[in-house]
């Protein structure tokens, strides 16, 4: 159940009121309640920008009926309106590709034109004009464009336009690496990620599955696992990449407040091409400085990408095609004395994207986009290496498609409607195939051979959304909603966990540990134990995610804008029905000149529960997969080194661990007495987050903008699994002996017996997280041949469980909450990111990205199950008490990446660029994973706080990439 502290009593009451309302309002009723607002609704959607302002005469009187138009220089897109009785106007939902010419005219006054007005996604530019009969007396004030202070919103974000995207070193040209210049972003490495095709990260104090991806206004999320973006976008197809870290308006939801907004390029009235060849040579890279190996492990990449766009019908229809092909070869070293060598993992990826923009008429535009993302990795996370032989390799596959169609209709000069429909297929969304399905053989300390764990999962999503924008007087209203239907599931859990062909573990003596004896020479007499999985391994889950919102950006005075919103989210997979999220923000233009803005905000945001949680309840539930295990001589023990054809008749099934869903007491009562469990929850709930911020934005000089903000984030009801059939509390002090498993089991509410259950886990919403930060961004827009972004965050994240990370068992299941309160494993007190570029003489460009971050914590464990509860996460006793959670600290993480580029003009329109990039230039030891096993004594083991091997634990050493680029 959700918990809250007394300072947040008003939140509890708000949710209680919402629950009463929700009991009496059906979905249709909810729509009817909000319907009157549909004629009062917005300014722009996430993939467009807007302009608004006031037209006055020299005496300050409003000019009624003045003509205002915006014309795109590249596409010919044109829209116009007239001012109302107060001289106010607004032109909304303007595409971002290219710049605009804004024209203002009225009979008897000199007309005024503004060239090169560049808009930002989801931002309204204020353009106020004072017209006069003499053009020299015309005055113009502009805020909210790409080069100006944002004065209409409290939203915190960092934006990269197409030029900044080009001039940022992006490792492997992966789109998700573009978040690195923002200091509020932290790497999520070490939290169970396997998606090496993308950079996984967190925003502020959230979890790695709590970031929303938005592509051209539609969802880019994968509701099945929420690991990363559903379909990657070729880098050359991006028009804008914006990270929204806080104070999001009501149109954003289903996350703890953070979002990544991607806007793709559209074609223009001229043909454009952009073709890139990239090569990462293995011979130039350094050995990772933290590696335990004495040799380099080459990581070779060849990439071809391209983009071609142009007109089909000038000023009316434009197209864009983009593609990217990757071929990566990464070696891992097999160190076992049994068969030392090198295993080459191969990674292939193909990205395709097509976009079509068509002006149906002067009031209606149509946009269609198609994406395809396909990859295969033959050695994910370098699983083969060390003592793991090539026969244990698995192929990791993913194939995703997305198609989106949107239509924008200008219903009147002040009302615009935008409708979208999207289809997303992940077929498979995740697939693990053993390279050679076979029984696994484990020779302790020597080798692991063979693999039979497999997974094949799919996800099909359909989204329909509609947003109506309406401007009336000083109000810019938005009303909208969307519905997503997701159907996912398949065979296995996310990474595969069942040895369907069995696993033999050999003895620790004799021939089993002799590297001179091949595994094929061993016999059943050398085996110490055996296990094999049986049972149901499939699951499917269908769910709806739907939402409605209303937002009013009210320009209360000429210098004060209030952002008022309300959002409702519903995820049918959970039991939460009162997810109302109010949003409030303000932006105050201090001096009225658009150069100093004070802003603040507060809002409530609900996180989505990933659909593959169902795998835990079905595959790991009472009727799911179970494992038979036996030692030599036991009932049913195999007579040869071959898997069993079926569960052995008459063999006992030892008490097993299961996971059950909240709110299903009647169903589970047929398996055990559920009333004996400790705090079985009656509902599966969505975690919710309170976000607040206050800060200032100041234009220090032309093109120099400084942002300083305090950010507070409090997440309540974090979902985590907990053993509700845990043994009694076992207090450990110095010298206290370990409790045996048998003694612990005797104290469980439901006593474990053969064919029964031991650990009975359920998802409970009792986790909490608090994040406090000061975020500073100094942005120098491009001028005088250089651009610069300095981003610094001072922060502290404390939680009682790590969101979206595996291994969430507490030290003792009877002591959670304040007993588990500690630093997040992703807590970094300081993080600095400095990025930019400088145009040098002779057509050279030099630039780079430097990131410096404090050390991350790691959890310290004893390495033994001291309380006998079946979870080997017990923390050691230090100074007469159990050490706190995540009490260890690693080493600081530094990375300096630079590039040097030279451009050659082949013809007037054709340019060739040659570029060299170096990543981790100084080969700093950036270790992610730490060995946290302290031991059970008073002094740590020799291996404590050392770095395990493998790419999951160490960032790459120094690497070089070279590019050739042809543009026209």
Task: Say what each PLM segment does.
Residues 707-853:
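Gram-negative outer-membrane beta-barrel transporters
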Residues 70, 98-107:
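A short, solvent-exposed beta-strand micro-motif common in secreted/extracellular proteins
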